[in-house]
From Swiss-Prot:
Residues 489-639 form the Helicase C-terminal domain. Residues 1-10, 138-154, 162-174 have a biased composition (Basic and acidic residues). The Q motif is unique to and characteristic of the DEAD box family of RNA helicases and controls ATP binding and hydrolysis. This is ATP-dependent RNA helicase mak5. Pfam families: DEAD, Helicase_C. Belongs to the DEAD box helicase family. DDX24/MAK5 subfamily. It is found in: Nucleus, Nucleolus. It catalyses: ATP + H2O = ADP + phosphate + H(+). Its EC number is 3.6.4.13. Residues 228-437 form the Helicase ATP-binding domain. ATP-binding RNA helicase involved in the biogenesis of 60S ribosomal subunits and is required for the normal formation of 25S and 5.8S rRNAs. A motif (DEAD box) lies at residues 363-366. Residues 1-33, 78-174, 384-404, 693-713 are annotated as: Disordered. It comes from Emericella nidulans (strain FGSC A4 / ATCC 38163 / CBS 112.46 / NRRL 194 / M139).
Amino acid sequence: MGQKRQRDQKGPTLHVRKRKRTGKPTNVAERESKPEVVVGVDDLNWKEVALPDRLDNFEGFFGLEEIEGVDIVRPQGNGQLRFKSAPGKPGKSILKKPTPKSEETEFDDEWNGFSDEDLEKKEGASTVNEVAKAADVNGKKGKDAKNKKDIKAKEPKKKLKEQKEKDGAQAKDRSITSGLSFAALEDEADDDGADISAWEPLGLSPETLTSLSKLKFSTPTSVQKSCIPPILDGHDVIGKASTGSGKTLAFGLPILEHYLERERRKTIDSEEEKEKIPIALILSPTRELAHQLQKHIYGLISNAPGVNARTALLTGGLSVQKQQRLLETADIVIGTPGRVWEVLRTGQGLIRRMQGIKFLVIDEADRLLSEGHFKEVEDILSSLDRVEDGGPPDEEDDSSEENVVPGVERQTLVFSATFHRDLQQKLAGKGKWTGGDIMNKKESMEYLLQKLNFREEKPKFIDVNPVSQMAEGLKEGIVECPAMEKDLYLYTLLLYHPKHRTLVFTNSISAVRRITQLLQTLQLPALALHSSMAQKARLRSVERFSSSTANPGTILVATDVAARGLDIKGIDFVIHYHAPRTADTYVHRSGRTARAGASGKSVIICSPEEMVGVVRLAAKVHANMANGKKLPLESLELDRRIVSRVRQRVVLAARITDSNIAKEKITTEDNWLRNAAEDLGVEYDSDEFDQAKGWGRGRGRGRQERDRQVGSTSKAELAGLRAELKELLSQRVNLGVSERYLTSGRVDIEALLREEGNNSFLGQVDPLGF
């Protein structure tokens, strides 16, 4: 019983045979026996090839059609070429689709008048109907219900679809017409909105007023009061106002009003839009500003009842295909010039649709229209002003009068805090320097009229603050220090403001990377932002810096990519680690604080080499100062005791940071050389390469030697430096107070226990003098 029964391996296997599949070969034979469909050129289902709007080297090659899945049948002799379906391709798929009979006979039936035959047919049909009625009198009652059901069941679906569309249009009409009264304001009784009585003189719609109430915008700013009425009246406007004065709403509200007017007109006229044409195109110089504009306008739209306007954001770093799909249904297009031009140039029919926009908004116009910066802006403007003549647009013949729109129907809105070209002149240098009036209206108008094609000969120039473009609540200061001790004075300034959200500006990407690592080594919450970062990383840094749940002492180290238009609430302090190169850069940098009537501080850390540029800066920005100040930039004196106490911290952090950066640089260079040697099939020896590189005396030799020495720091040495720095950071900066006898000095013990005041210092610290 314990033994298993063994199978006879030989007997059964000799007689078992695999079943042959006979069905498939017969089907193949039948399939092969079927005659192949051979057709001519005109019988194929040709598909037109979609071409982009802007072509470079096609040279008039249009009307291209293609077909896939066909083989060429070459006839004997010189006959006409024939085609058949490729193997594995159904024959019907390559044939042209037959037109329905209804379409064929729709235009073939013509009325030829009355004839005697038609009258005889009608008389015969009437007699047959009378006989049928007499025969079915008794069974009429029993079939009425059934006939009604059949009629209802056989109702065409087209009528149901039309009814649904009609009901939807009526519902939409009710939603918009209901917004014509102030009933929309009563629907949100539970939400404590702001008092918007100050907005009523501007003549805005109830939907817009509801949105402003929800967003807590109780009072319009001076630029909004001055710009909104002429924009609503259809004028071209050039608006100049200080940073943080609400320029986004100054052009966003008229765009929303035009959208509401267009929707009301469509419902009254019962018009169906054949093709979606955007209302406005808004251009901005940076991606962060474009994202911010989209966020503000979307908030304005989403809080307005019955408004379903769509926005499309076109910036670099994101998918082009997705942005093209968003552009198909967009009402408002916001983007940077490079990506907007790329999407328009590679799309089909997008330039023609964009020519129908009603508003062209150029935010931060002095930056977008500056010489040699944004060539795509000129391409966009020329394409919007071009008339289609039935052929491809000729890029070389831009000056021809035949291709330019004679009368532009769109409004052009231009906004910035600085328009004068003199502000874009470099402050440092030996070139000719011109001071004077920075708000020369005549030169600004001539400069803009040369660049833009306005609808009016003289657009309205609205200057809200002609004397100074700096915010009223902004305090400006300067800290003088040696060139090699900027890190020390930067850290000291940050210790003076521990709970202030600070923005540090530099002039280079390498400085952003180094300062960010330095501050992080000093255990400060620092974030980086520059143009070489990936788009998602840039958005992540801005989101973390502006988050309400973030550390109130968060520091953002950025290049001038964050200088324009970035509206982040709670920025109290702006530090210029490097003196700005131009005066308009200083204006926009300092404008990140003291926004919307709030107060803020702006400090320049100035070395002796930068003093000439800072003096010119003060002369340009504060040329027409009328407040009676002798010095527009106050000189700040830091406590020398604090500077000497924290010097060792900064020295240790700088050694650690420089070592890490040098090691990363050496590793990156070594990996690049190793990969290049592998591609060339050459053996790579790092020691031999370094020895060969040391023979020369080229430029940068000293820097390379210094990087090699700094990068040679061992891990044990770095660990010792980190431990020493950690010990120093765990202690407060002692300003001459005995730690054993705290009550003997000027120390507020109760404030220390409650953790009030500046926790970085132990002792009395006088605040900065501004």
